Amino acid sequence: MDKTQRSQGKCPVMHGANSAVASNNMDWWPKALNLDILHQHDQKTDPMDPNFSYRDAFNSLDLAAVKQDLHSLMTDSQDWWPADWGHYGGLMIRMAWHSAGTYRIADGRGGAGTGNQRFAPLNSWPDNANLDKARRLLWPIKKKYGNKLSWADLIILAGNVAYESMGLKTFGFAGGRADIWHPEKDIYWGSEKQWLAPSDNPNSRYSGARDLENPLAAVMMGLIYVNPEGVDGKPDPLRTAQDVRITFARMAMDDEETVALTAGGHTVGKCHGNGKAQDLGPEPEGEDVEAQGLGWLNKKGRGVGCDAVTSGLEGAWTTHPTQWDNGYFYLLLNYDWELKKSPAGAWQWEPINIKEEDKVISVGDPAKKFNPIMTDADMAMKIDPEYRKISERFYQDPAYFSEVFARAWFKLTHRDLGPKSRYLGPEVPSEELIWQDPIPSVDYRLVASEIVELKAKLLASGLSVSELVATAWDSARTFRGSDFRGGANGARIRLAPQKDWSGNEPERLQKVLKVLSALQASLSKKVSIADLIVLGGAAAIEKAAHAAGVNITVPFMPGRGDATKEMTDVESFVVLEPLHDAYRNWLKQDYVVQPEEMMLDRSQLMGLTAHEMTVLIGGMRVLGTNHGGTRHGVFTDKVGVLSNDFFVNLTDMAYSWKPVGTNLYEVVERKTGTVKWTATRVDLVFGSNSVLRVYAEVYAQDDAKEKFVHDFVAAWTKVMNADRFDLA
């Protein structure tokens, strides 16, 4: 069937299909709470068998054989996408870099950990142009090793091997990145409605003088880092330096790492802009089926090799773009540079009066040479005073530069992989790095009878059910499944900065920690504070469940260590501070975003589903764990009893709900007009949202008392063990 015939036919599905252009619920009701971020990545989208373990599969992989195949690929140029100077290293490094470079510290999202570069929007971002070709070049290797090697791991490994093949001694490589199977729904990339929109356009990510919206790190929609031509495409290295500094800081990089990564990334490979951007076809997501997932295809010629167009800039940064050397700093610091336009019309910097021997051999004709080029960000490494000092040192000490870069590259490509306990493979570095949030291992075991005895001592310590539960929750709730930071393991709630966070109620926290420390000191057997905190929560929940008439044992696995202040980078933990916690009915202040939206975001980071979120909220309310002891949402007369009262009263039509202030409501008896309870938006949303109400009704039913307790315990245990990667 040709396109003409297809366009004339009517939809064969009665009333139309909802796979493409039909309106969905969010189109009709844009203010409705969208729970999709809690429903992504479920087993229905995962083609792997239910018992498949990527960890086990990767551990059976012959990594040396994979690396040998990658080494061979680097110089095996293909006619359909020829390698620059016969080496794919620059392309593979850019692919790996752009996979890892979407990471941002504010929420831990982005990064290389899921293979998300295969999906929209990343696969079609302007800054990722022609990386579809890099992944197609890797397909024979992925096909060969199958499920033992994820795309996420292969992409980073390819970048590592590319550097090694060009002479760099890398710091190491760890596997363990499991693939996802559809685009992520939880990542906010910005609110702009067009690619590469200038910062003064509507829906800009900038406010004030040039304040970049959190949690974003990139300066434009569709870019990984900064605009290579300058701020909003206007060359000015000093202004660009500020963009670079903010962007890399939001990726957890300091100035030295920033200079090293910029220089090391541009020591090899080249920019492509020897043509017109308007000659390129759509990005992969916008192409037709015959393109088979490829995009940016040249409509007026092959558009490959020396005629390729990617960023629009044209040229290499160094004289020898297929070898690791110090040529970047040699050229940058020894020549004066002037602004020029590339053949595609992009701004770039070129050297003045360059020596013939310092020019770059043409990709297409070895008899020709061209000027090297620098982006505005490269010029920032020379013009900005602090970056200049670092550049000078790297230039004078190439070995130091190589070491700093290798470590920074490892950090860039492993930052979102989590602690070292998640690392897989024979090339994992032995050195503990502070950005990995190290936790000491424990050397004790607890048998069942000892755990029972400890629970009794915790319940007899004078601490209340709410104090024990709230402390365990506060310790564990920092976990982020995005970059696997935070959690109860390490008991960093006792250390700065967590011990002083207002969300942790420092005065109450210190009271609890003092009691737990005294209990720890009295024990004949060593037990970590981290384990005691979690066990205290378990003991309290068992007591509350028993009071509700349900006998249950909360699962507990000892083995958590206690981190020290020397193991803790205080500054890096600042971003984990909770500014809201729906589970404890707390907001640090009023925000533009509605509390229920923030609840979804936090729940998604913790790895919770919608029904797990629901049952935890209901349980935490009746246990009396609200921040500061407030009574909002505590729909029960039996505080401290793990009952389903929250849901019973929420769904009871004997009550009406009236707003009495910002994020505050009264629950009023319809017959008498008496105020029975107070509530917040995150309480009432479980009765107002149609999906959440369905879950609330399940737990409000007369036959749900035991189910509620069992489901609460299961969800609680999931949160407490979220960072126990040793149990995987």
UniProtKB/Swiss-Prot annotation:
Keywords, ordered alphabetically: Heme, Hydrogen peroxide, Iron, Metal-binding, Oxidoreductase, Peroxidase, Signal
Tryptophyl-tyrosyl-methioninium (Trp-Tyr) (with M-251) crosslink location in chain: 97-225
Post-translational modification comment from the UniProt entry: Formation of the three residue Trp-Tyr-Met cross-link is important for the catalase, but not the peroxidase activity of the enzyme.
InterPro entries associated with the record: Catalase_peroxidase (IPR000763), Haem_peroxidase (IPR002016), Haem_peroxidase_sf (IPR010255), Peroxidases_AS (IPR019794)
Catalytic activity of the protein: H2O2 + AH2 = A + 2 H2O; 2 H2O2 = O2 + 2 H2O
Chain residues that bind heme b: 266
Gene3D superfamilies: 1.10.520.10, Peroxidase, domain 2
Gene Ontology MF term list: catalase activity; heme binding; metal ion binding
Active-site residues from the entry: 98 (proton acceptor)
Superkingdom of the organism of origin: Bacteria
Subunit structure: Homodimer or homotetramer.
The family this protein is said to belong to: Belongs to the peroxidase family. Peroxidase/catalase subfamily.
PANTHER family: CATALASE-PEROXIDASE, HYDROPEROXIDASE I, BIFUNCTIONAL CATALASE-PEROXIDASE
NCBIfam families associated with the record: cat_per_HPI, PRK15061.1
Function text: Bifunctional enzyme with both catalase and broad-spectrum peroxidase activity.
Protein name as it appears in the record: Catalase-peroxidase 1
Species for this entry: Shewanella oneidensis (strain ATCC 700550 / JCM 31522 / CIP 106686 / LMG 19005 / NCIMB 14063 / MR-1)
